[in-house]
Regions:
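Switch/communication elements of ASCE P-loop NTPase nucleotide-binding domains
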Residues: 1-48, 301-438, 457-458, 468, ...
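The start of beta-strands in P-loop NTPase/AAA+ ATPase cores
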Residues: 4, 200, 347-348, 447, ...
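Flexible phosphate/Mg2+-sensing switch loops adjacent to catalytic phosphate-binding sites
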Residues: 48-79, 334-344, 381, 472-474
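Extended helical coiled-coil dimerization/tether regions that scaffold
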Residues: 206, 210-351, 511
Length: 676
């Protein structure tokens, strides 16, 4: 029995979001302010154990607020009928199997099943924050003032909050695979406690009160050890031994107290013997509690393996303390679930942003360890902003939250993985492997730039600074994928709707089956050997590729392919022209006048370029030899790229400039920041 999915309606940015869950670990990813924390919070508010963490009118979604205001501002006499009362709904979709699940698990949900049909394997529990009397709510809202000068939205929410009409209700019903209800039985009403008896949840939030200053006296790790102690089984021999020792200490202390306070107690008895309290005899005893002693008298300390010195808890870094604290919390949860008097069939642990205070290497260690700490019968849901956490997970465990205007959509990456594992195994394998090579940054970026190799990756930050400065205020990611593999990443970019450009090379070759590399020029004897260009721009005459308009280089309005074209060539004084085949010769053509200046003769460390500039001082001569130099097997691309990053006033080829400006414009049109 598992929690298969969660549907959220009307809560903050979650206008209507369905999140499917894995049987084991589910990782929720996305940019900042895409509703990841809200996803955890609404579950905590409806079925968590924190009674002070309730739902309020301020949690209503922007869409519901807008509909309410529009209806109330309507001048129609039927305005009251048009008012849509806001509500918040959390639906827990539980899958069960009558053959495989234990009798105890089936028994826990049996009272709430609304069909005896054995084909039904889904129970939905609807948790709802809604008014008990909609008519009354409508009346107080429509009677409220609607003067534009007032903060009418705040006033309406306050009226709803103070009305006392909104209550949280729980009901369950059976549903079939096609989401139909095949009987007319009413839904079963539940209490929050009855829901928690089916689905037990625990939470570790990002804001843990840990400090690494020497003045920190909170001893929070000691508190974590105390909780772990409380969750250990009553029949654990080690616990009994510890309790016996505490009892022995208690007896010894009581005897000592009796002797120490003997005179004082005798004098008190003497002075009170003639009063109504004279028949009472005072006694001072020790009352020790093991768990309280662990917290109040136990201190976690660290021993340095190299020097054998012992240091207090506060002297260790936040990262190690955070990791230790979280592991202790998980172990305590395990013990609680294992030894709970009322065993629940579904147990879920939520961990919010475990990367807080953990450096990248420790983040990777954490995610590898955490899933192994939980029993296979439990579900674990992690929200994260960390590509290091994500790089350790499989594609099928990922759920990508994306903000579109004022609402969140959830992209189930397992759907993409299942489709491409069948339809395009190469794309699936490429993305799966690249996840561990930091392609995971895609899930946290506002846009992506895919490049051929190290040279492009080194030069792109300077290009952005020069050509598209507004991109610097966004979270862009530059991913090195090579000319061959870019085409396998594009389907994922389109699935998660991430604006992207691919900066690649035209790769001109002879127009025959195994054509050799050739210098580009407008000729029917040439073609492009670049797989990404051929698949996403199209196989066409080389001359047409050189002059293709922008619209035909853009795929599904999301991904633009950028390659060397007509504008990236070099015009000689006689009417002749050389065309660029790679970024390197395109850079030389765009900066031939700069390279010809005396100030750069000693600047370049790339040997072939250095030799060229020492021999030539004419820009035409430099451009004439550019193709042969960058095509030479001894040409050092990375060194040349670094050399170029240090050149003031460097001009980037038009195909790079145009691509970056296009990406800048597309990103600026999208709502990439909002509250969750």
């Amino acid at each position: 029995m598992k929690l298969a999915a969660v549907r959220i309606q009307g809560y903050r940015a979650h206008e209507d979001t369905t999140v499917t869950l894995e049987n084991g670990l589910t990782v929720v990813v996305g940019r900042n302010n895409t509703g990841k924390t809200s996803f955890i919070e609404i579950i905590d508010k409806f079925i968590g154990n924190n009674k002070r963490n309730g739902i309020h009118a301020t949690d209503f979604s922007a869409g519901q607020r807008r509909q309410l205001l529009d209806a109330l501002r309507c001048k129609s006499k039927k305005r009251n009928n048009n008012v849509s009362i806001p509500s918040i709904t959390l639906t827990l979709i539980i899958n069960y199997n009558l053959k495989d699940d234990t009798r105890e698990d089936i028994a826990s949900i049996a009272p709430y099943l609304t069909t005896l049909d054995t084909e039904c394997t889904t129970l939905e529990i609807e948790c709802k924050y809604t008014p008990t009397n909609e008519t009354y709510i409508k009346s107080i809202l429509t009677e409220s003032t609607t003067k534009k000068s007032e903060k009418i939205e705040d006033k309406l929410l306050k009226l709803i909050e103070e009305s006392g009409e909104y209550k949280t209700t729980y009901q369950a019903r059976s549903t079939f695979a096609d989401n139909t209800i095949k009987n007319t039985n009413e839904a079963r009403i539940l209490t929050k406690e009855e829901v928690r008896a089916i689905v037990n949840t625990e939470y570790i939030y990002a804001q843990i009160n840990l400090d690494d200053t020497s003045t920190d006296n909170g001893h929070h790790l000691s508190s974590a050890f105390e909780r772990f102690y409380k969750e250990v089984a009553e029949d654990t021999q080690l616990r009994h031994d510890l309790d016996d020792r505490i009892d022995g200490m208690q007896t010894s202390l009581s005897n000592a107290y009796t002797q120490f306070f003997e005179d004082a107690i005798a004098q008190i008895a003497h002075f009170t013997s003639d009063t109504s309290a004279g028949s009472l005899k005072l006694k001072v005893e020790s009352e020790l509690n093991t768990s309280r002693m662990i917290n109040s008298t136990t201190r976690v300390k660290y021993t340095d393996n190299t020097s054998s010195q012992t240091y207090p808890e506060s002297h260790n870094g936040l990262g190690y303390s955070r990791l230790t604290y979280t592991i202790l919390q998980i172990l305590a949860f395990k013990e609680h679930w294992k030894h709970s008097q009322q065993s629940t069939p579904i147990n879920i642990l939520f961990i919010e942003e475990p990367e807080a205070h953990l450096h990248p290497q420790m983040q990777e260690v954490f995610i590898r360890l955490v899933s192994s700490l939980l029993d296979t019968g439990s579900q674990l849901i992690i929200t994260t902003h960390s590509s290091h956490v994500l790089s350790e997970r499989h594609l099928k465990s990922l759920r990508y939250f994306k903000r579109i205007n004022d609402r969140v959509v959830c992209k189930d990456i397992s759907e993409w993985a299942d489709k491409y594992k069948t339809d395009n195994i190469k794309a699936y394998t490429t993305v799966s492997n690249y996840i561990q090579l930091r392609i995971s940054d895609l899930f946290f970026a506002d846009c992506a730039i895919l490049v051929e190799g190290a040279a492009e990756r080194l030069l792109l930050p300077k290009a952005i600074q020069t050509c598209a400065t507004n991109l610097r205020s966004t979270h862009y990611t530059i991913i090195e994928v090579g000319g061959i593999y870019a085409k396998h990443i594009i389907p994922l970019l389109e699935f998660i709707e991430l604006p992207s450009i691919v900066i690649t090379d035209i790769d001109s070759v002879e127009n025959k089956q195994h054509g050799q590399k050739a210098e580009p020029k407008p000729s029917p004897k040439l073609k492009s050997a670049n797989p990404t260009i051929n698949e996403y721009v199209g196989k066409m005459a080389f001359t047409e590729l050189l002059t293709l308009d922008t619209a035909r280089k853009v795929h599904n309005n999301l991904v633009r392919i950028c390659y060397q074209a007509e504008a990236d060539g070099y015009e000689f004084t006689p009417p002749s022209k050389k065309y660029a085949r790679t970024l390197e010769d395109a850079l030389i053509y765009a900066n031939a006048h700069l390279f010809a200046s005396s100030t750069l003769k000693e600047h370049f460390q790339e040997p072939l370029i250095k030799k060229l500039l020492q021999e030539e001082s004419d820009k035409d001569s430099i451009a004439e030899k550019a193709y042969n130099i960058v095509s030479d097997n001894h040409f050092q691309k990375t060194t040349f790229a670094i050399d170029c990053t240090l050149v003031d006033g460097l001009i980037f080829p038009p195909y790079v400039q145009e691509g970056l400006l296009w990406l800048e414009q597309v990103v600026s049109k999208k709502d990439i920041t909002a509250n969750s």
